[in-house]
């Protein structure tokens, strides 16, 4: 066994070791690495898994073990080691397994695979594999070598005791002493209890005799009681017959009264139907009357409004006509004034033109005169010039100036001419605008007139639609009222059906309707009652009786659909439903007789349905015939043996029974459902009609909205046109004003142009005169002719100017007059005339006349409607009076029928209660009779009533009273006297045996303590001898030529080297006074010629080497599967390192070594080198070659302190002087455990065989009796319990046996003569200890029981022992001695478990078959499971 892989995650410096493809070598593995890389943490992880590392139990201690780097700490971690278990050193049936220890702040657990283990399980597993807690030197830590080197002699002795297992012996001794003390205490208690039980047994013996007398009296009492019950049963039977006859009378009477009540009920129902119908009609007429009255009020209001509107239009017409006359008068007056002004203007125009012509002539003349005058004046003024040249120059300059003026005038004239043309065009444009405005105004007036006519037509249409909307509203309101009534009737019928049906069915149907509405599940046809119609209504009661709850069975297409619905109902835990899947239901054709008359027909013929539901209908109604009367039904039933039913619901069953009677029609589910169906159809039809009416109303409202929208549009257009007319009038006024203004401007510009042309011409004439003068001779004086001309011209000029002033004044007056008249014509008369014309056009008296006519027409129509409404109102009042007169006799009839039905119903209720009372009495007497007959039958085998027939009931009661008085005197008898007597006797015998066992076990324990002391001394001596021998041999191997030995020291040995050498002890002899030794000394010599010296005289390296030699000696004496060595060569020099390395390499043939080092010697001898590296915050163990490991060491060897000359152990050295490793010194403990496990297994086997024999015997004796079956069942239960315990003990034995063999034990066969007799005392001691442990719990349980509460029962109580026999029971007979001798010889033999297991299985199978025949097999499993805990608790001892 060795370590193959190591996986570490989250442990100290190891973040995640991960998987390495190279396994650890089963020999010598050497680990190197830098300081702080994680070598020691690797060993700590292995120790953590093996349980050697001391870790606290709190979370803080485990937190210290978790990997932490860079401030990040892992939450969990684990250490896992894969072990090679090919030698099966571990008690696991695997050649390889992995053990993991997972830890964190909140958990710490071991596991192998998926199986979790406790720390104790892991510790036991390692101890079984040879990791003894008494020899912890398979892990050598840093500093442990130094501790061994500096250890005192007394400490070495303690270490040797620990290795030898002395501590185990001490623990066993303490346990044995505790058991002895407990046994003595229990023995005293048992003696006291025995005295009490002996006294109690004597009392119970007397009570047993009283109990026998009591039981005899009880038996007589039961016999008389059974006889009295027999007599009472006969009396009950007679009473039942009388009650049945009385019930039959009431039943006949009730049937007659029921039919009578049914007849009255039908009449009452018809009268109530008529009454309700009349009430409904009255209510309807009353509602209609209210609506007609409201309609009359509406028409009156409408008529009043129309009259008011008509008066308004009349007033409006009168005002419009008055205004029109006034406007026309003003228009005529203004038109005359306008014509007069126009005539005056026409008169003024010629005069004005003539004066303007005269003015122009005078201007021409004056201009010519002025020009001539100017020439003469110039000529006259020539005296100022000295010469012609000067004169000509002056004239030339003046001509130039005048030419410039002429040019300017011509430009101005040209501009004026252009302005005049523009003014003329503008004037034309304004004229066109005026004409267009006038035309547009006329067109808009026509449009307004047309719009008004269209609006009037639309309003008429709107009024008609409003009337239709009003009537439709009335119809809808009436339909809604009827719809509410229908819905109330529908819901009332549904509530009535719910009260009749049971609640689960009602809830189921409600949920079914919801499922159908959701539509997620297809194929639901609905309840059967929905799927047919009743052809003959009088057969409703018959269908109700035959259908029953089957009426509400749900018809579906397949059973899968039914399963889906049921799943929903079960999930929601609501309702119950039954289903008829059409794919499953099949019916046989009924054997009906040939029907030759109309008195009988199949019930299925009175309904109609879809052919797909034929099978479903046949399933419910197909087996019954409906008959006209009872006689026919009885005749058909007898002749054809089929079920028949009458229309009254009386059923004549084919087997002879007849059921029927009164059925309240209010409680008939089918009738209620038909009512639901009727009102639902009425509701749906009315709902459809209401929807159509509402749709019609929506269309009318849409039309009304459209017309109103059109009216608003037309009115908006008219208002817009009227608004535009106002704007047009303003625009027209503006056009007229602008036109007048442009005319005036044109006239002014023409005048200015004319004047400007005259000035231009004058200037030109002046220039021509200057040119003429230039051409004339220079003369400074005028001629006489010229002077006269000058005088004449001067006078003419004055006259002309005077004339011009006069004419200009006249022109201005006429022009002003003309302008005034023109302005008055255009601004006043024209504008006002246009306004008057617009106002006249805006006035529309024809429209008012039309409105008056329309309103009158509407008033006439309203009058017609009012007359019709009043006639209808009178008709409704008359109808109400007629209905009131008609309903009164019906009300009287209803009251009388109610009184009669109430009387009959009360009588029927009384008869029903009487029949219920009779039925209850019959049932009560039936129960009494049946119970008494059952009691008589159950006791008929025990009692013989022949002897008691001489007694009647009274005499029997008298005898029973006498027996009861006798029993009263014995009422305090102890009913459990027999059981208690047997129980106390058994307890007495058991306690005697227990007391004897305690005496025997105390003696055995004392012998065991003595034996353990001897064993301990032998173990210490044997261990010391082996360690001393191996120490000497190891030291010689490490130091050739050297010698060393271990010596035992006593108190008188002062020197460290003094003491006894184990070689001086005889073989197998334990030195006397071993416990007087005080320590173990060491004497060593490091070569020939060297004196032996003690540890105190050695150097540090030598002490280390001696300590290593001692460790190797311990390892050879008690080897472990592998060893962990942490830098054990740290204090050695090169030669010693080489010696230690070679020795480890030799030991690694059989044992795995994992060592850390800083030197090259271990590296050279290693089978596999490993290097610990620290990278990225975590340590990792990686395989390396020898060169890689040496490079790491050389990097650390800064001072070249190591010697690298050693090349490893040679093959010759490796094979020379192979060390022989010893066997663990605790072999005898393994043998002890083996014997104890074997003893337990044999004891369990014996108990199981005994129980098996009892069970087999009971199987053979079993009969059909229930008691024998129960006994066999009980025996089988006990055997299964003991069989399971045996299997557990056998498995435990096999595990211990394997370990025993692994430690060198030999399994002997039965009857082996070589069995040592010396083992018998120890075996007996072991047996007594086991008995003591098994009986301790039994004794404590026995002491807790109270004697009076014992319920133990035995078939035959054992014979009680007398106190004088107590001492004889302690001794053992010769037969018992031989039996124990035989058992002792079998203790080390093997157990053949195949044969008993096979036999046990056969017995169990046979018993199971027996029990299965009696129906008891099913209960065994639960009972067996209840006993599992008891078995497991028994197996844990």
UniProtKB/Swiss-Prot annotation:
<keyword id="KW-0067">ATP-binding</keyword>
<feature type="coiled-coil region">
    <location>
        <begin position="672"/>
        <end position="777"/>
    </location>
</feature>
<feature type="coiled-coil region">
    <location>
        <begin position="952"/>
        <end position="1007"/>
    </location>
</feature>
<dbReference type="InterPro" id="IPR010935">
    <property type="entry name" value="SMC_hinge"/>
</dbReference>
<dbReference type="GO" id="GO:0030892">
    <property type="term" value="C:mitotic cohesin complex"/>
</dbReference>
<dbReference type="GO" id="GO:0007064">
    <property type="term" value="P:mitotic sister chromatid cohesion"/>
</dbReference>
<dbReference type="GO" id="GO:0006275">
    <property type="term" value="P:regulation of DNA replication"/>
</dbReference>
<protein>
    <recommendedName>
        <fullName>Structural maintenance of chromosomes protein 3</fullName>
    </recommendedName>
</protein>
<comment type="similarity">
    <text>Belongs to the SMC family. SMC3 subfamily.</text>
</comment>
<keyword id="KW-0007">Acetylation</keyword>
<comment type="function">
    <text>Central component of cohesin, a complex which is required for the cohesion of sister chromatids after DNA replication. The cohesin complex may form a large proteinaceous ring within which sister chromatids can be trapped. Involved in chromosome cohesion during the cell cycle and in DNA repair it also regulates DNA replication. At anaphase, the complex is cleaved and dissociates from chromatin, allowing sister chromatids to segregate. The cohesin complex may also play a role in spindle pole assembly during mitosis and in chromosomes movement.</text>
</comment>
<feature type="compositionally biased region" description="Acidic residues">
    <location>
        <begin position="1420"/>
        <end position="1437"/>
    </location>
</feature>
<feature type="domain" description="SMC hinge">
    <location>
        <begin position="522"/>
        <end position="636"/>
    </location>
</feature>
<feature type="compositionally biased region" description="Basic and acidic residues">
    <location>
        <begin position="1060"/>
        <end position="1070"/>
    </location>
</feature>
<comment type="subunit">
    <text>Component of the cohesin complex.</text>
</comment>
<dbReference type="InterPro" id="IPR036277">
    <property type="entry name" value="SMC_hinge_sf"/>
</dbReference>
<dbReference type="InterPro" id="IPR024704">
    <property type="entry name" value="SMC"/>
</dbReference>
<keyword id="KW-0498">Mitosis</keyword>
<dbReference type="GO" id="GO:0008278">
    <property type="term" value="C:cohesin complex"/>
</dbReference>
<keyword id="KW-0539">Nucleus</keyword>
<keyword id="KW-0547">Nucleotide-binding</keyword>
<feature type="coiled-coil region">
    <location>
        <begin position="806"/>
        <end position="888"/>
    </location>
</feature>
<keyword id="KW-0131">Cell cycle</keyword>
<dbReference type="Pfam" id="PF06470">
    <property type="entry name" value="SMC_hinge"/>
</dbReference>
<keyword id="KW-0132">Cell division</keyword>
<dbReference type="GO" id="GO:0005634">
    <property type="term" value="C:nucleus"/>
</dbReference>
<feature type="region of interest" description="Disordered">
    <location>
        <begin position="1330"/>
        <end position="1437"/>
    </location>
</feature>
<feature type="region of interest" description="Disordered">
    <location>
        <begin position="1050"/>
        <end position="1070"/>
    </location>
</feature>
<dbReference type="GO" id="GO:0005524">
    <property type="term" value="F:ATP binding"/>
</dbReference>
<dbReference type="GO" id="GO:0046982">
    <property type="term" value="F:protein heterodimerization activity"/>
</dbReference>
<dbReference type="Pfam" id="PF02463">
    <property type="entry name" value="SMC_N"/>
</dbReference>
<dbReference type="GO" id="GO:0051301">
    <property type="term" value="P:cell division"/>
</dbReference>
<feature type="compositionally biased region" description="Acidic residues">
    <location>
        <begin position="1385"/>
        <end position="1395"/>
    </location>
</feature>
<dbReference type="GO" id="GO:0016887">
    <property type="term" value="F:ATP hydrolysis activity"/>
</dbReference>
<keyword id="KW-0175">Coiled coil</keyword>
<dbReference type="GO" id="GO:0000785">
    <property type="term" value="C:chromatin"/>
</dbReference>
<dbReference type="GO" id="GO:0003690">
    <property type="term" value="F:double-stranded DNA binding"/>
</dbReference>
<feature type="coiled-coil region">
    <location>
        <begin position="202"/>
        <end position="503"/>
    </location>
</feature>
<feature type="modified residue" description="N6-acetyllysine">
    <location>
        <position position="107"/>
    </location>
</feature>
<dbReference type="InterPro" id="IPR027417">
    <property type="entry name" value="P-loop_NTPase"/>
</dbReference>
<feature type="binding site">
    <location>
        <begin position="33"/>
        <end position="40"/>
    </location>
    <ligand>
        <name>ATP</name>
    </ligand>
</feature>
<dbReference type="InterPro" id="IPR003395">
    <property type="entry name" value="RecF/RecN/SMC_N"/>
</dbReference>
């Amino acid at each position: 066994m060795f370590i193959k892989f190591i996986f570490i995650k989250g442990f100290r410096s190891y973040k995640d070791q991960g998987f390495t493809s190279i396994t650890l070598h089963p020999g010598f593995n050497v680990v190197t690495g830098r300081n702080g890389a994680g070598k020691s943490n690797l060993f700590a992880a292995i120790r953590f898994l093996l349980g050697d590392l001391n870790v606290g139990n709190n979370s803080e201690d485990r937190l210290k073990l978790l990997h932490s780097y860079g401030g990040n700490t892992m939450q969990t971690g684990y250490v896992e080691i894969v072990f090679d278990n090919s030698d099966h050193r571990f008690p696991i049936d695997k050649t390889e397994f992995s053990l993991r220890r997972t830890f964190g702040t909140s958990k710490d657990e071991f596991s192998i695979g998926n199986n979790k283990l406790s720390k104790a399980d892991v510790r036991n597993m390692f101890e079984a594999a040879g990791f003894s807690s008494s020899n912890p030197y398979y892990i050598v830590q840093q500093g442990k070598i130094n501790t061994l080197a500096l250890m005192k002699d007394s400490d070495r002795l303690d270490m040797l005791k620990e290795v030898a297992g002395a501590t185990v012996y001490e623990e066993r001794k303490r346990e044995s002493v505790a058991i002895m003390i407990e046994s003595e205490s229990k023995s005293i208690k048992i003696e006291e209890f025995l005295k009490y039980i002996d006294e109690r047994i004597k009392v119970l013996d007397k009570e047993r005799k009283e109990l026998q007398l009591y039981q005899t009296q009880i038996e007589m009492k039961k016999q008389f009681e059974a006889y009295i019950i027999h007599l009472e049963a006969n009396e009950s039977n007679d009473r039942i017959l009388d009650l049945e006859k009385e019930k039959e009378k009431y039943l006949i009477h009730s049937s007659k009264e029921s039919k009578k009540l049914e007849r009255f009920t039908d009449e009452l129902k018809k009268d109530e139907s008529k009454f309700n119908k009349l009430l409904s009609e009255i209510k309807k007429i009353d509602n209609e009357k209210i609506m007609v009255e409201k309609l009359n009020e509406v028409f009156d209001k409408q008529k009043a409004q129309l009259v008011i509107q008509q008066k308004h239009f009349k007033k409006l017409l009168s005002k419009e006509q008055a205004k029109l006359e006034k406007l026309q008068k003003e228009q005529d007056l203004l038109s005359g004034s306008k014509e007069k002004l126009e005539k005056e203007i026409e008169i003024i125009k010629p005069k004005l033109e003539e004066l303007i012509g005269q003015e122009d002539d005078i201007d021409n003349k004056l201009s010519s005169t002025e020009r001539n005058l100017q020439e003469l004046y110039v000529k006259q003024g020539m005296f100022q010039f000295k010469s012609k040249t000067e004169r000509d120059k002056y004239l030339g300059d003046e001509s130039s100036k005048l030419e410039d003026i002429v040019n300017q005038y011509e430009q101005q004239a040209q501009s004026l001419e252009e302005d005049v043309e523009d003014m003329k065009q503008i004037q034309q444009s304004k004229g066109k605008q005026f004409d267009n405005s006038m035309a547009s105004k006329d067109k808009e007036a026509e449009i307004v007139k047309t719009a008004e006519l269209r609006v009037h037509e639309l309003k008429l249409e709107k009024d008609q639609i409003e009337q239709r909307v009003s009537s439709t509203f009335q119809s809808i309101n009436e339909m809604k009222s009827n719809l509410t009534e229908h819905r109330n009737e529908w819901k009332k019928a549904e509530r009535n059906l719910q009260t009749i049906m049971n609640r689960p069915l009602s809830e189921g149907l409600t949920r079914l309707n919801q499922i159908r509405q959701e539509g997620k599940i297809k194929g639901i046809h609905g309840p059967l009652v929905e799927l047919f119609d009743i052809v003959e209504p009088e057969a409703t009661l018959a269908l109700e009786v035959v259908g029953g709850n089957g009426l509400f069975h749900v018809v579906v297409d397949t059973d899968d659909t039914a399963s889906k619905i049921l799943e929903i109902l079960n999930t929601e835990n609501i309702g119950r439903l039954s289903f008829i899947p059409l794919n499953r239901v099949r019916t046989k054709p009924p054997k009906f007789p040939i029907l030759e008359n109309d008195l009988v027909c199949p019930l299925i013929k009175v309904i109609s349905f879809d052919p797909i539901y034929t099978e479903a209908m046949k399933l419910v109604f197909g087996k019954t015939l409906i008959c006209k009367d009872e006689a026919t039904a009885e005749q058909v039933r007898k002749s054809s043996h089929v079920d028949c039913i009458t229309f009254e619901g009386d059923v004549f069953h084919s087997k002879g029974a007849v059921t029927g009677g009164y059925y309240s029609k209010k409680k008939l589910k089918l009738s209620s459902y038909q009512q639901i169906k009727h009102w639902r159809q009425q509701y749906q039809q009315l709902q459809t009609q209401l929807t159509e009416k509402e749709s019609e109303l929506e269309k009318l409202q849409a039309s009304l909205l459209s017309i109103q929208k059109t009216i608003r549009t037309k009115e908006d257009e008219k208002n817009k046109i009227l608004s535009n007319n106002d704007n047009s009038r303003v625009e027209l006024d503006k056009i007229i004003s602008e036109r007048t203004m442009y005319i005036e401007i044109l006239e002014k510009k023409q005048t200015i142009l004319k004047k400007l042309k005259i000035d231009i011409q004058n200037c030109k004439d002046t220039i021509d005169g200057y040119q003429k003068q230039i051409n004339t001779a220079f003369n400074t004086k005028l001629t006489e002719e010229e002077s006269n001309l000058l005088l004449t011209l001067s006078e003419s000029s004055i006259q002309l100017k005077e004339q011009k002033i006069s004419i200009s004044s006249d022109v201005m007056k006429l022009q002003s007059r003309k302008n005034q008249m023109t302005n008055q014509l255009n601004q006043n008369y024209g504008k006002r005339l246009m306004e008057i014309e617009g106002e006249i056009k805006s006035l529309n008296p024809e429209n008012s006349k039309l409105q008056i006519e329309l309103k009158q027409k509407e008033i006439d129509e309203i009058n017609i409607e009012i007359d019709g409404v009043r006639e209808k109102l009178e008709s409704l009042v008359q109808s109400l009076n007629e209905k009131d007169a008609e309903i009164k006799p019906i009300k009287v009839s209803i009251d009388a029928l109610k009184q009669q039905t109430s009387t009959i119903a009360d009588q029927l209720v009384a008869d029903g209660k009487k029949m219920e009372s009779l039925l209850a009495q019959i049932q009560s007497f039936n129960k009494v009779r049946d119970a008494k007959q059952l009691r008589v039958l159950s006791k008929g085998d025990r009692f013989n009533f022949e002897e008691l027939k001489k007694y009647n009931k009274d005499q029997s009661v008298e005898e029973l009273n006498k027996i009861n008085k006798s029993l009263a005197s014995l009422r305090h008898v102890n009913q459990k006297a027999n059981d208690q007597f047997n129980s106390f006797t058994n307890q007495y015998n058991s306690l005697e045996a227990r007391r004897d066992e305690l005496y025997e076990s105390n003696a055995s324990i004392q012998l065991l303590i003595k034996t353990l002391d001897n064993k301990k001394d032998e173990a210490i001596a044997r261990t010391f001898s082996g360690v001393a021998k191996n120490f000497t041999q190891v030291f010689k191997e490490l130091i050739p030529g050297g010698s060393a030995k271990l010596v035992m020291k006593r108190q008188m040995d002062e020197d460290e080297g003094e003491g006894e050498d184990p070689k001086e002890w005889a073989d197998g002899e334990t030195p006397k006074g071993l416990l007087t030794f005080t320590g173990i000394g060491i004497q060593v010599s490091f070569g020939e010629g060297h004196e032996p010296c003690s540890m105190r005289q050695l150097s540090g390296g030598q002490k280390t080497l001696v300590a290593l030699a001692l460790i190797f000696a311990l390892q050879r004496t008690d080897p472990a599967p592998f060893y962990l060595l942490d830098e054990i060569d740290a204090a050695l020099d090169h030669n010693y390192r080489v010696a230690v390395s070679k020795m480890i390499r030799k030991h690694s043939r059989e044992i795995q070594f994992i060592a850390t080092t800083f030197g090259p010697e271990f590296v050279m001898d290693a089978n596999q080198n490993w290097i610990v590296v620290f990278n990225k915050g975590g340590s990792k163990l990686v395989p390396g070659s020898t060169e890689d490991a040496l490079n790491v060491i050389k990097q650390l060897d800064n001072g070249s302190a190591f010697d690298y000359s050693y090349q490893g152990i040679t093959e010759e050295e490796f094979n020379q002087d192979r060390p022989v490793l010893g066997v663990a010194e605790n072999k005898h403990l393994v043998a002890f455990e083996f014997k104890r496990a074997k003893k337990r297994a044999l004891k369990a086997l014996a108990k199981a065989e005994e129980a098996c024999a009892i069970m087999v015997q009971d199987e053979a004796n079993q009969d059909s009796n229930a008691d024998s079956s129960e006994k066999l069942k009980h025996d089988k239960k006990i055997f299964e319990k003991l069989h399971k315990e045996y299997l557990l003990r056998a498995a435990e034995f096999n595990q211990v046996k394997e370990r025993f063999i692994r430690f060198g034990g030999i399994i002997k066969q039965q009857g082996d003569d070589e069995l040592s007799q010396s083992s018998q005392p120890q075996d007996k001691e072991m047996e007594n200890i086991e008995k003591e442990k098994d009986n301790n719990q039994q004794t404590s349980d026995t002491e807790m029981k109270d004697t009076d509460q014992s319920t133990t029962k035995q078939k035959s109580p054992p014979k009680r022992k007398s106190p004088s026999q107590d001492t004889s029971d302690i001794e053992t007979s010769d037969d018992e001695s031989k039996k124990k001798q035989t058992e002792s010889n079998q203790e080390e033999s093997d157990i053949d478990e195949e044969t008993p297991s096979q036999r046990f299985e056969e017995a169990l199978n046979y018993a199971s078959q027996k029990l299965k025949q009696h129906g008891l097999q099913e209960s065994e499993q639960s009972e067996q499971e209840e006993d599992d805990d008891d078995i497991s608790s028994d197996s844990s001892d």
